[in-house]
């Protein structure tokens, strides 16, 4: 035993056997201890070796446990258990076998053969079940191939393909892959490249979510169906998992050893295996431990060039440029196959192909109009992602929402249940009372409780019946899908009798049951459970993701939009044309008649200070979002220098703040449906207007990091004081001299706000008083302002130069200041009504 050189796993098995014998109080380490240690090893080779000779490892393990239970125990023995004669013989046999096979280490498979040799109880057990020494030796090739054991951890390289990859063709045979619709040109191009003699390595390049991985799954399905040229017939497509290959590689060289084992297996398959690596850029640098170290990319280069490894890669445009193109030697070994984003029409076709899978998974019905809505709405509103992925996600989430509602108790049942609980508590309280009134009330309450319990039972039964009907349909659909998969498998395997029995017997039978169950599920009246995904459900998900109201307008919202001028007019006085223009823009967008490739509206508001330009933008945000803060306000006076343009869209690469994004672009990316106010636009540097040209015309803007930000659901309002006080012609002349023609030409409308008339001031007084009243509501104070007092405020607060702002200050001074003093002095208390009148001399207002 001087030359005994065990692998890490063999040493671990011997240690585990020693510990097990010691814990059980056995004086000797018997072959049964060694066998149990080998069978219970994580990632051990004993179980696969037994399976390779047709023996069930669980059976052997159960027998070994019974043997261990019968072993003698020595109590009080302090010394460690020693190897028994049979165990020593097994280890010696393993050592001789390793020498015979020219292996440098005694591996666990050598030890398994040693345990099966001789006349020990374990040897009889293994041989009796068919795991004879000769059978186990013949199985070596299946498990470890023709490789010699030259490292202390060879087990990590055994069955490397099974450990570190997924067989896509096997998954396709089992029907576990989603159907691939379209993409014929891309699959044909992949097949052409794979059929080459050398450099037969296509790399699928495209944006995330366009279906690169699906193309490889489509190839696997075609190979299984036999719909490929002779050169690819009966080939196996495996998806390599580099993550699991790197995971747990503790020592330098361990990752390379695993990868080499996988590559050797692929090489030995003589071209039968096509390898797929998703996220191909991960091979660059994978497993490298320092400068100049070998990584996965460098290890596979020679095989790629010689055509020994047929590799299909998939990666995005950015990552291909960043990682693969940098390594020219690696890039030249790949043939690029560009995968573009499918059109909306193609996406609808893809969704129709996937519809059955999602219906079976969620147990709901998905209407065709929902699929069309998913494709169109995702294309229109979810701009940062790509079809068909974003459309599939919409359908999936809408269906999962509906499934969650079906599984939850309906609101009607919840309400009745709470009422029953409340009545039961009342009943218990009244039962303790002795007076006649309480007894009479108790009788009425019991009658009501009985009615409500009956109603609850009826509702629960109805809900349960509806749920059962939906479950029956789902189970039948699952059954049908399983049978169709079995039928396809039987046909491929040439079992025509089974295929005929399924296709003409069991499948029509289940289809008939489904046809009978569907009308029953659909014909219910006053349904409690909705089981159909429609366009409105898709629109709800879009709204939840983006905040954009994409759904059909409800009656309440329609009425609200039709009277939009009245609502905005309550806040902005005397500017009918501006209110009309903004209202028309919002209605066009919500009715779907606006140009989808431009912002909802873009306006320039001109006029003197204090006439309501900024107030209209706030009122619009308040109207649309019920929150006046839901507005991006950019004070253009802060953008007077040339370099400040970078603050709007984000600093370019190489500058400080590059990773932070721009103030305008980031605000719109986070909230794509918003009002953007560019206040005092004339104070900005002229270069800022060049940035806005693209927004006004195309509805998009590229930020400092190269991302396109969508402005198509925003309303842009630019305010300016240019030419204020002049005539309309003078104002427009000032605008034309300050802004370039291409900038003015891209605006929807240039609206001139007129100075306020004295008659309009009373309405503004009402607005200012209403705002003050809202602040006083917390103290339950009510102001009663007389008409003369309002007229006094309007007269004193009017200033044609400064607009309505002096009026706000006057309300604060004449009413707010007096009221504050009276509250502090205790003259006015919470809940009081405070009258406001003009003083006898007409110089001030009197409170109280």
From Swiss-Prot:
Parts of the chain that traverse the membrane: none
Q: What is this protein called?
A: Chaperone protein ClpB
In this chain, ATP 1 is annotated as bound at 206-213
What family is this protein classified in?
Belongs to the ClpA/ClpB family.
Question: Which branch of life, at top level?
Answer: Bacteria
Record the organism: Mycolicibacterium paratuberculosis (strain ATCC BAA-968 / K-10) (Mycobacterium paratuberculosis)
UniProt KW Repeat keyword: yes
Gene Ontology BP terms: cellular response to heat; protein refolding
Q: Report residue spans for region: NBD2.
A: 557-755
For domains, the record's comment is: The Clp repeat (R) domain probably functions as a substrate-discriminating domain, recruiting aggregated proteins to the ClpB hexamer and/or stabilizing bound proteins. The NBD2 domain is responsible for oligomerization, whereas the NBD1 domain stabilizes the hexamer probably in an ATP-dependent manner. The movement of the coiled-coil domain is essential for ClpB ability to rescue proteins from an aggregated state, probably by pulling apart large aggregated proteins, which are bound between the coiled-coils motifs of adjacent ClpB subunits in the functional hexamer.
- Recall the GO molecular function terms of this protein's record: ATP binding; ATP hydrolysis activity
* Stretches for region NBD1: 159-341
Coiled-coil regions listed in the entry: 392-526
